Amino acid sequence: MALPITDDDLDGLKQPYVTFSSGSASPPQSTTDAMDLEEQVLDAIKSDAFLVDWVGEDDKGNPQNLPYWRKWVITMSLALYALSTTFSSSVFGAATHVLAEEFALPAETVVLGCTSLFMVGFATGPIFWGPFSEAFGRTRPLLAGYLAFAVLQLPIADARSLTSICILRFLGGFFGAAPSSILSGILADIWSPRERGFAMPTVGAFLTIGPILGPLIGSVLVQSVLGWRWIANVVAIASFFIAVFTFPFLPETYTPLLLARRAERMRHMTRNWAYRSKSEEAQSSIGDFAERYLLRPARMLALEPILLMMTLYVSVSFGLLYNFFLAYPTSFIQERGWDQTTASLPLISILVGVIIAGALLSFTTNSRWAPNAKEGRPQETRLLLMMVGAVSLPAGMFLFAWTSSATMNPWPQILSGIPTGFGIHLINMQGMNYIIDSYKIYANSAIAANTFLRSLFAAGFPILATSMYAAIGVKWGTTILALLAVAMIPIPILFYYFGAKIRAKSKWQPPL
């Protein structure tokens, strides 16, 4: 029969071994008894009795139990980080022709250096920021990345060559990717799955609103007495302002790190070194890192039809969004003769479409348009709204293309941005949500692959658009891209009917 293990027994293991002389008053225990006791102590240590976890559902240390107002402060802080970094991704597009004249370079080269390289950095950043957020918690990588992003804006304002701007823009994208890489983890830390249905569309809307505001505000700055260099200064000032007023309200939310800190406190308070958290038991190697953050996302993207096709569709729609940041100014300046600031105002219609789509997603969170296993609605239910967006996007693009003539009233072309923005946001959000629903515990790997490809498309489309619009004009260039959007329509329809069967055959299908 096993002897009961007490803290005194565990404390005994911390003491040095005691040797007995021939004159000892009492003889030592036999070697067998000592070994049996040690085995019992070790078994007790290995048991869950000393495993530190949350104490009940109401544990105040659990980020899920933060006050409701505090959760929304955190959520809106993340939305502001996303807004400022994605704003920076597109804002220099407004200075393309000014920079081309100042540095005597082709417009395509300026687009490559100022917009595309930023998005390449934005694509590579998550490879590092994701692991950092799991190794060091959420707040430290978030703070480090965001502040570095803000600081890197300052030398851009004094840059004397496009090469310097290119390097700084790439680094700005790399560090600016930190909030976008970490925010989904923080939202999962503090919100329940049902509550995330309201929080995620809010942050997602800011991720799309940011790049839309970039050309609008950038055009105003470029045309003002401040000039293009103040674009970087404005981004820096806004980012520092956001950081100062939000970081004091951001607690650490990563559960493994919080439990490890609690276990450390308990060890020091009780002098019982058996207390530990699950994360402290895990041993990670470079091979584990490569598998989790590099190899698995690549394999999933190559072997998973759902991930591959959904990522392709989301990436195309995201690339089309960045394409319009050039299409609108090109059409309204070159074909209608508007000045740059006025020509950027029609982009507001895309913003309106995004806001309408975001509101629709929030209002339908608990409706028949959303998945609900208890009511028999599978993950594929999300694709219903995605189908609506799939039709809306090319419809808006065709309207934009075929009303772009200077002889036609500009309002149809201006208002075409509403169905365009509406469609882009529905495709992006519902596509991402469907990926998360489909892979659950492997969602981080799936989203990493998605983010990488999506950012590369956003980097490539502006270069493509610059050359294409110069060669064949806005009407036919946008028509070709609209046909590409039409070709994507069958994707959500296909997975709506066959997605469940495809998921059942997946190697990465999570257990029920």
Curated annotation (Swiss-Prot):
The name of this protein is: Cercosporin MFS transporter CTB4
Protein source organism: Cercospora beticola
Q: Which InterPro entries match?
A: MFS, MFS_dom, MFS_trans_sf
Check the record and name the Pfam families matching this protein: MFS_1 (PF07690)
The taxonomic lineage of its organism, from the top, reads: Eukaryota, Fungi, Dikarya, Ascomycota, Pezizomycotina
Name of the coding gene: CTB4
Similarity comment: family membership: Belongs to the major facilitator superfamily. CAR1 family.
Identify its membrane topology class: Multi-pass membrane protein
What would be an example GO MF term here? transmembrane transporter activity
**A single Gene Ontology CC term:** plasma membrane
Q: Principal localization?
A: membrane
Q: Cellular location of this protein?
A: Cell membrane
